[in-house]
Design a protein with these regions (language model features):
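Non-catalytic scaffold segments within catalytic domains of secreted glycoside hydrolases
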Residues: 1-156
Length: 156
């Protein structure tokens, strides 16, 4: 992270580092989608949390990473979720992970009838894909993921 954001991150004293290093009980993760990234030339703006990276919704061939939703930034891609779980596990010494929020919006959902809203095949597909990806991360990749909370109507 320091490589990406440089001096925009605070510096810890050795005492502060010793205090926080290894002190977490679990890793809580909100996740909705994944993105492609590419290097961006020049210096990033001071408030640009991506540093010198550009976040993209399609690959070099112009293929979208996932289907459109009501939220322009949210494109479901469950494989990216699994890869991120594995990366976090490898990077941080296999911490216990709880997915504290995960979900999607549906393109055009504000215009649907009650009957159409109740027959929500898109979210059924989304949760099946994401829960399966999480289960695969646990069983095949050795990720210590222990809990999952869905993004629901109670969150907004």
């Amino acid at each position: 992270m320091r490589k990406q954001l440089g001096d925009r991150l605070p510096k810890f004293t050795p005492e502060q580092r010793a205090l926080v290093q290894g002190s977490n009980d679990f890793y809580g993760m909100n996740h909705y989608c994944a993105n492609y990234i590419k290097h961006k030339s020049g210096e990033p703006e001071p408030q640009d949390y991506l540093g010198n990276l550009e976040s993209l919704l399609s690959n070099k061939a112009g293929q979208d990473i996932g289907p459109e939703t009501q939220s322009p930034w949210l494109r479901p891609y469950a494989i990216g979720f699994r890869k991120l779980l594995k990366w976090i596990s490898d990077r941080y010494g296999r911490p216990t992970i709880y997915v504290t929020e995960n979900g999607t919006s549906l393109k055009g959902e504000n215009d649907l009838s009650k009957e159409e809203i109740l027959e929500d095949d898109f979210r059924v597909w989304y949760f099946k894909e994401y829960v399966t990806a999480m289960a695969d991360a646990y069983t095949s990749d050795g990720v210590d993921v222990r809990g999952y909370m869905a993004w629901s109507l109670m969150d907004k």
